[in-house]
Amino acid sequence: MVIWNPWHGCHKISAGCANCYVYRRDESIGKDASIVTKTGDYNLPVKKNRQGEYKLTAQDGMVFTCMTSDFFLDAADEWRQGCWDIIRERTDLEFYIITKRIDRFEQCIPDDWGDGWNNVTICSTCENQERTDYRLPIFLKLPIKHREVICEPMLGEINMEKYLASGLIEHVSCGGESGDNARPCDLRWIQEVRRECIRCGIPFTFRQTGAVFIKDGRTYHLDRKLHISQAKKSGYSYVPGMGTANAIKYKLPERQALFERLQRSDFRNRFHLSDKDRNYIAEKGIDVIRSHAHDLILKRLSAENPENDGKQTPMKGHPVFIAQHATACCCRSCLEKWHHIPSGKVLTKDEQAYIVDVLME
């Protein structure tokens, strides 16, 4: 990995900027991060050694660009064309550009940009729902070959599935905020975006917990050295088809506590077996109904990413359908929220048996 900062300094424009790490670091050494200056590394990707060879090679990895500023900052307009010239010259390098200013993209690209350059990935940040709904519609309409989204610092629950469903976003990452004044990040927010990525078949990375992390309603204050390691340890990063979710450790809910919680749900309490349902069960026999439940779980819920998950009603009118909704076993999202079984993994035989037992109780 290479960091290329052709200029330094930035201007805060949204909620995600409030506790900017660049401002924190500059303030600690007596600098003003709002003053934007060209750096000595401006020509870094095209610098050569004494043999006339580029110092940076493709083996050095992705070139993360403008990590102490924003590539599309208006204060850097006079320097940007030179950077495009460098990126054009170094087609053997991959450049990664993160921005909060995706709305300035079209006025900042070079004349020969076309439908995008293969060696450039543009990553739009989305720290909350308001910025997501503003930036992503713009992002998806732009001529870009490689798009990614990063929710960091993640400041609230975000729903972006309608944007992910476009098929234009290649990767999503989320993470909490660092620093002494860090705002909290809730694991539930991370899990929801992760589930949306799974349903859309998009790789997801949980980058860091942040300094203030909420899990199961409990708030944890974490040392900086633990932010990344704890996120990695959680196992919540996801790569389709790679079995990554198998690393997630979880504990099934205690059965009595589960049913007490279900009884407190107005939605779950809407589902009751009718006399017709009970007669059907008596006619078929409990073993047949159990086999129906087992077949349903195996065929409709056991896959890593079930087709039409949460939208299918294959046994509507069947007692098992009623039980599915009453016990929150209707989709993989509910299985995670209510039963702690992670999304994005193939259900084991033990997990399938547990779900059948819950349905039949």
Predicted regions and their residues:
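Immediate flanking context of iron-sulfur cluster ligation sites
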Residues: 1-14, 308-327
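Active-site beta-loop-alpha junctions enriched in small/polar residues
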Residues: 68-70, 100-102, 125-129, 152-154, ...
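Auxiliary Fe-S-binding modules of radical SAM enzymes
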Residues: 1-8, 161-246
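The feature represents the first ordered module of a protein
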Residues: 259-312
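Conserved Radical SAM active-site core
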Residues: 1-120, 129-132, 158-169
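Histidine/lysine/aspartate-rich catalytic loop segments that bind and position anionic ligands
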Residues: 124-132, 137-165, 169-170, 176
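Short, compact, well-ordered microdomains
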Residues: 83-87, 91-96, 104, 206, ...
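Conserved, mostly hydrophobic/aromatic
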Residues: 17, 65, 97, 139, ...
